[in-house]
Amino acid sequence: HRKIKHILGTKYRDRVGRLLVSELFTVGQGGWSGFPPHKHDTDRLPLETRHDETYNFRFKPDHGFGMQLVQREDGKVGDAYHIVNGSTIILDKGYHPCVVAPGYEMYYFTILGGLSQRPLVQFFQPTHAYQIETIPGIKDMIAKFK
């Protein structure tokens, strides 16, 4: 799972427009982040908000690597991107979990820009949404974006 540190979180609501800026860390070595698969590419409250997102990745040790997945349509095969130290990914559509290889730690700096509002409402892929109940700390992480 992951640990999150908000740099421009909800407490700065009146001073930063529609930006959310955070640092995310994998906890332990290897593992998934952004799981269960989620998206935020459509304004349809109360289920989801439209936020474009940019990630910049770092690994420890710096020769580590991971994979960014992007599934643009539910039920269809998506894209997989090999990410290394310094990789930048821009996401504007689709479910987008990522994973770091065993034996490595992953950090990523993330900037989310809300197109209509600042608070983020993530829509979790229905086939995997039940995982929210099984992952320690995930509900607290979700609440911090609102």
Model-derived features: positions:
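Active-site region of the double-stranded beta-helix
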Residues: 1-85, 100-146
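Short, charged beta-turn/beta-strand-edge "cap" motif at the junction between a beta-strand
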Residues: 95-97
